[in-house]
Amino acid sequence: MKQVLIETIPFKVAPMQLTEGLKAPSGNPLVEGILATAEVKNGNGRYYPKDLWEREIDKYNQVVKENRATGELDHPDSTIISLKNVSHIIRECWWDGDKVMGKIEILPTTSGNILKALIENNVQVGVSSRGMGSLKEMNEGTLEVQDDFELLCWDFVSTPSNPGSYMQLVKEGKEIPTNSYVKVNSILTEILCANGTCPIF
């Protein structure tokens, strides 16, 4: 039976740099990195064959071309992308060996502004694929994703399941290391209270 399948990869921020990050033609910031890895058992015990990912990426690239490859911040267990929660749009997808790479534009929506602030302040989040499909046990502890799998989108979430992969802000210029730590609550407060009213108090 098909079910919602969610896979998450860590998302880490590059060190602060002297120049601003590269931006999309719209002026919005871009991030890039690994979206998924084929032919390996991930942190959820699932195995995605490469030919399965190749088929789905070919289909998804059409969605990218049509300017519809949006995703959410903190995705639901749903097959529907909620436009009111959209935070980003994927602009490019390509292969690097067994890794699916992507370039993502962060949108100036409520969720996108929160995501941008978190990334700029070195808060680690995860990039997570959302799809529908069924599973078959290969061996003890490993479930193979079956041919009925359908990729829906990629979302940004808080809990990583696939260690070792990350995305970073697309920047150029000399790097300046930083060890500053900013609490998530402080970032959210700054965003939500920017217009002079604070709905969280």
Show where each model-derived region lies:
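Polar/acidic, low-complexity leader/linker segments enriched in S/T/G and N/D
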Residues: 1-63, 176-184, 197
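Residue microenvironments linked to proteolytic maturation
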Residues: 3-5, 10-12, 72, 88-185
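Short, charged/polar surface micro-motifs in flexible loops or helix N-caps
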Residues: 40, 77-79, 107-110
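A short, polar/proline- and glycine-enriched secondary-structure boundary/capping micro-motif
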Residues: 44-45, 82, 112-116
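Short conserved beta-strand and strand-loop elements enriched in small hydrophobics
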Residues: 61-80, 127
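Glycine-rich loop at the start of a catalytic domain that most often binds anionic cofactors/ligands
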Residues: 85
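Noncatalytic, helix-rich "gating/capping" subdomain that lines the substrate-entry/channel surface
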Residues: 184-192
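Short acidic DE-rich linear segments
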Residues: 191-201
